[in-house]
Amino acid sequence: MMHQSLGLGLVVFVAAPVVAFQTQYPLSPPFPERLHEEWDESCSISKSTAFETFKGPNNFSTSPSEHIHSVKITPSINATNWEQWEFDGLSHTGLSGLLMAFSRDASYAFFGQGNLRVEFYITLGDGTVIQELDYISESYVADCPGFTAGVWNSSDRSYSFHVTKDHQFARLKFDSWRVRGGFTMSSSTKPHLADGSPWTADGGKADATEISPGLHYGLSMGGADVNVDATLSSGRRIAFKGRGGSTRLWATDGWLKLCEGWKVFRAWAGPYSIVYWDVMGRMGRPGKYVSGHLFYNDELLVGSRVGNVSAEEDYVLFTDNYDGEMSGRYKDKNTGHTFEFASPSKDKKWKFDMQHVVTQYEMGAGAGFGMSGFANRVVGGEVGGVQYEGKGHSEQTYWPEYIEEWKIWLVWGFGFLGKGKTYVMKMVSYVL
């Protein structure tokens, strides 16, 4: 589950036809000096402990009117369904990145570590990779009038998020043996759902949150300014600014039953921001499912689940490219991608080329299956118009229907390997 200078006048002219590769960004609101973060009696609090699951069917909400960050599964998850809150950012250079995901998920209960975990990746320009998959004792999600907040904590470490109800601001904090600090996010994009419709409290189509059968999605922040400031246990400070966003995922079953793989992208180029999901579904009617959002100066241009050419509906086309310099280690050897967003009603198209430039993380599952994350160079814009250059993050996966438990122990079980986990994961990614 995926941002160069703020000067607007930087223009590089190339050979005829004249095209301006410009670098600029949407202007997000400044992060406030303080956020109201007090939990009181006006808040509804959902608590979940590490080994708590609901026996039998529970309440699984697919409502398009519920706030995107609200708890979707009540009173708690059961043995199959799960939910996740995800936040990510990439530096303006594209060399440093951060991804943080909070999950309530019993998919890997056989580890004996519980159902609460935090996935945490930081990649730095010098090649340093910090990978955390931390199993936590308890989690709280507070749904308050002005914000939604979550805390995943154990006696010696804590991770938290705080998102305002208007989806403009988010603050993330982490305090563990490996890294301490946080990051802020400021966005002026409106929240949207999987079908491209804007989220409103009045609701939308009944299936508006569904990407593929069993998998549901809300886009809280399509594009946001990100400011990261953290310190490693070694004393080294990590600080960068960039672009990123936030998404919500919840599903009826584990990933291996839901799909054989996915490709996820968050990118920006000049005033454009792109968020795209491509899922090869296994449930219901197996096949390819897409959800794409294209913003211009933080206003939605195209939002659609249509992945083929249409004369009437907005659509998005996606193609893998193989002519670049960098690919993943596993079966999928693409070196980049091309996106084409189209709006027949506006008689306009937008095209963007994305090329992998940095491998951020990889995890293998054997026999060529696995997951790869990349930082990317992005170039594009309106067809026949000004072209812009930017950066992006992508993640691609390809999974078998079944993974032997010993391999899952290696791939996902590193959360309790202790301080040597990063070195173990590097070794595992090459072995598998």
From Swiss-Prot:
Its EC number is 5.5.1.-. Keywords: Glycoprotein, Isomerase, Signal, Virulence. Belongs to the Diels-Alderase family. Pathway: Mycotoxin biosynthesis. It comes from the Eukaryota. Glycans are attached at N59, N78, N153, N308. InterPro entries: DA_C. It holds the Pfam family DA_C. One of its GO terms (molecular function) is isomerase activity. It is an enzyme of class 5 (isomerase). Residues 1-20 form the signal peptide. The gene is pydB. Hexane cyclase; part of the gene cluster that mediates the biosynthesis of pyrrocidines, fungal natural products containing a macrocyclic para-cyclophane connected to a decahydrofluorene ring system that show potent antibiotic activities toward Gram-negative bacteria. Within the pathway, pydB functions synergistically with pydE, pydX and pydZ to form the cyclophane. This is Hexane cyclase pydB.
